[in-house]
């Protein structure tokens, strides 16, 4: 049974994680409540952080205050903390408290913009992994010109062996079935070429395993130049390559969006033309590729819902990370993945 407060889904928030915290977190919670809550779903927040910084914000953002419970934690995980240091020395941090809320059943999931390595280390220590999962991976849903796809790993595992890549493909396929509603997801390994001989030992080894796996619809290698075509449902990479690919794509999208706006709206004449002919269609395309609405990434394989928002997330980005958490909980994602894993086993 999901933790609830007055029948609301409960989300724990690490209010001190991220470049613009706690303002981005409290504003983000408010933006979510005002704009992103689906009909019929009610959400309540457990907020953890420094009272001196957060209390004035809760007074200002009354809707958040009215739909939350706040607990003071003066310690927080810093951006440059190594995972091992955070695990040993940030025991009274807002991040750890939010994760423990999930472990203790006070919340159904948590969201943080904090240090990725620390968040993974603390989450794995407190929550553990799902049955038969060796290493969790970070997964996010990315847009293409045709459809969305799941990309993993995005930084949890910089170096991956053959077995890890194989399991990421398996978990990614399950994630796509549940989150993307794809019956038989097509899975590909990210590589520097499509020939079987290309890539490092881990990638080539994973290729051999996936090629013979009866429960994965494996389509071989995919190059970075092809991922926006929308022909694949799941793309698998080690955490180093996946993270670089995602951030490069997001930076490109942001730059492209800014350039379009700059060129389209640099005079009253073009403003009029765009307004008359292109505004609705242009906005639809720009929103589809806007990184802010794709901010959330899930730590897939943990025994609990943990969502990572970008460290530089603003209120809108953080709000969409909250929405990702709520959707994952509402879909009962982890229990469905456990069921899928058991069927494979």
UniProtKB/Swiss-Prot annotation:
The gene is plsX. Pathway: Lipid metabolism; phospholipid metabolism. It is found in: Cytoplasm. One of its GO terms (molecular function) is phosphate:acyl-[acyl carrier protein] acyltransferase activity. Gene3D superfamilies: Isopropylmalate Dehydrogenase (3.40.718.10). It catalyses: a fatty acyl-[ACP] + phosphate = an acyl phosphate + holo-[ACP]. It comes from the Bacteria. Catalyzes the reversible formation of acyl-phosphate (acyl-PO(4)) from acyl-[acyl-carrier-protein] (acyl-ACP). This enzyme utilizes acyl-ACP as fatty acyl donor, but not acyl-CoA. Homodimer. Probably interacts with PlsY. It is an enzyme of class 2 (transferase). Signal peptide: none annotated. This is Phosphate acyltransferase. It holds the Pfam family FA_synthesis.
């Amino acid at each position: 049974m999901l933790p609830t407060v007055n029948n609301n889904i409960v989300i724990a928030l690490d209010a001190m994680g991220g470049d613009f915290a706690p303002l981005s977190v409290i504003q983000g919670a408010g933006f979510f409540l005002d704009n992103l809550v689906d009909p019929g779903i009610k959400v309540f927040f457990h907020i953890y952080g420094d009272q001196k910084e957060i209390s004035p914000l809760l007074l200002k953002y009354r809707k958040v205050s009215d739909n939350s419970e706040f607990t003071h934690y003066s310690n927080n995980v810093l951006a440059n903390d190594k995972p091992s240091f955070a695990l040993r020395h940030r025991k009274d941090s807002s991040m750890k408290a939010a994760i423990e809320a999930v472990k203790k059943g006070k919340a159904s999931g948590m969201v943080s913009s904090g240090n990725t390595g620390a968040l993974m280390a603390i989450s794995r220590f407190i929550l553990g992994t799902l049955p038969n999962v060796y290493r969790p991976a970070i997964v996010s849903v990315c847009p293409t010109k045709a459809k969305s796809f799941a990309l993993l790993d995005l930084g949890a595992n910089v170096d991956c062996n053959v077995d890890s890549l194989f399991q990421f493909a398996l978990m990614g396929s399950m994630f796509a079935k549940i989150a993307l509603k794809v019956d038989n997801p097509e899975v590909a390994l990210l590589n520097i070429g499509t020939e079987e001989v290309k890539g490092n030992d881990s990638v080539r080894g994973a290729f051999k395993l996936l090629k013979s796996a009866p429960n994965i619809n494996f389509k071989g290698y995919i190059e970075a130049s092809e991922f926006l075509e929308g022909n694949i449902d799941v793309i698998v990479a080690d955490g180093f390559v996946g993270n670089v690919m995602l951030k490069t794509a997001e930076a490109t999208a942001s730059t492209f969006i800014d350039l379009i706006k700059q060129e389209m709206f640099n005079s009253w004449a073009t403003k009029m033309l765009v307004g008359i002919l292109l505004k609705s269609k242009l906005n639809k395309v720009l929103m589809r590729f806007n990184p802010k609405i794709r901010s959330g990434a899930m730590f897939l394989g943990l025994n609990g819902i943990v969502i990572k928002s970008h460290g530089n997330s603003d209120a809108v980005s953080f709000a969409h990370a909250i929405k990702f958490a709520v959707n994952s909980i509402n879909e009962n994602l982890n229990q469905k993945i456990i069921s899928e894993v058991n069927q494979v086993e």
